Amino acid sequence: CANHCYFCFVDMIAPHMRRSLSVKDDDYRLSFLYGNFVTLTNMGEADYARIARLHLSPLYVSVQCTNPVLRAEMLRCSWAGDILAQLARLEEAGVEYHTQVVLCAGLNDGEELERTIRDITARRPHALSLAIVPVGLTKHRTDPFPLVQFDRDGAARVIDQVEPWQEKMRAEEGRTFIYLADEFYFLAGREVPPAAMYDGFPQLDNGIGLTRSFIGEWDAAKECGAACGARLAVVSGTAVAPVLAAKARELDPAKRNIFVLPVENRHFGAMVNVSGLLIGADIAAALREMSQAVDGVLIPASALREGEDVFLDDMPLDALRAEFPALRIEPVATGADYYAALSDWAHYHRTRASGGYTWQSNAGYTKPVAGNR
């Protein structure tokens, strides 16, 4: 990676974590294979030639903004301002691309966001989508540049700014094109958009529309009947806990058997509220402090390493199970999983070929399977 971004999440990782978490992934090959977002700042002539020769499409590009001076400043890379010219080179090679903006309050929002949206929408049809995600900060951030997270009013302003553009895109070509991260709706206290607004969820792997997708999977799996009768605790990040609780009430309206347990992220800081960044130690602490007596515990599969039952702090899932031998602890990845576990706990078992959505740099999520936040 040629950058030292103001908002780099890799630089905010706590010490003594799994070493692979500190690997920066600004690599167009990973972008093509796994949907990782890249900035294109480390691209040379040979890279563009290879992309053209092999037709590596689509790619996933972290734009952040289209103002050349501001982009170079935010990425701390003097040659980062050429993003529109670089996108043009991809287009000349017949390459399509998805884009994202990591939105930082007071930097690339407001008029700068308006400029970015205008520039990227003008690059259709090569530009396939634009995702806007809020900057994520942890308590381990040491970068001296002041960044703040969006509050309720700030998130509402972003939604209000983007919605007219979404309506314009739908009027022009029947799809939304511009998608906001679920966190904006959570922060603003608003409902996430209906599934139709996500156009098949082209940036689901980036965490865009996970909540609506999860609800849709639940609804598709739901059958008439009540909960299975087992007493279950549902571990989640604080952001999505209300959504999980609302679904649980459909099966257990009296709140007698299903208890959603929002876990504060003590490791990264309370401002980090997604399920996929919960570590094993924080989950264990929450279970020790839990007042309800339960038979089983559902944990987010997204908190486990891709293809391996290990949390971000290198705690194996088996170690968590060993600490609570009286509890059956199972990962849940999708809305269908969640429904199956709550409605038929005795027969629920997920053979996990993959850990669901796994956090990657720049506030993104990576392929290949659906997951739970």
Residues of each region from the PLM?
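Conserved residues at the C-terminal ends of beta-strands
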Residues: 11, 62, 133, 181, ...
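Auxiliary Fe-S-binding modules of radical SAM enzymes
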Residues: 17, 121-123, 136-373
